[in-house]
């Protein structure tokens, strides 16, 4: 069932090539760090991806402490949903976005609680229940049906494929170059130190 859902989602994306709606100009990018940072990291992620959750648990806290909080690095989180559950979670994350990564961290830390279900509807139910349990204040149905946010999320994925040939998650782009080493903090730190 999951393979069928993923295949249907990919077909949906292929036929959704609309340009950004005018409203998208006011949708905030989920970021951390100073705009003036010398290094910009773009992280293409799917909220149902286990490796992405591991990045947020094992790599991101050190990256934030050593580079982002010191003004050396700015990170942008871009949506690359791999299935309908991730697509819906991305819409909720973007809708509830205050510009910081806190909603992403909440979704990744509780991923095993909500990223499950035999159907997209069941997974969406788990997502809603999880967010209610975490006291995340969001108009769930309105966010899921927001066309501007839907286009924004889909365009992140389309742009990732076109501009950087993203085909898996997480994919890390550093100053417009794909990071091709194993994604652990040691490798990332070594790479970033060469750019400072």
Cite the ranges covered by each PLM segment.
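Extracytoplasmic thiol/disulfide redox context detector
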Residues: 2-83, 87, 149-163, 194-196
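Cysteine-centric redox/oxidoreductase cores and disulfide-bonded domains
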Residues: 81-168, 173-186, 190-196
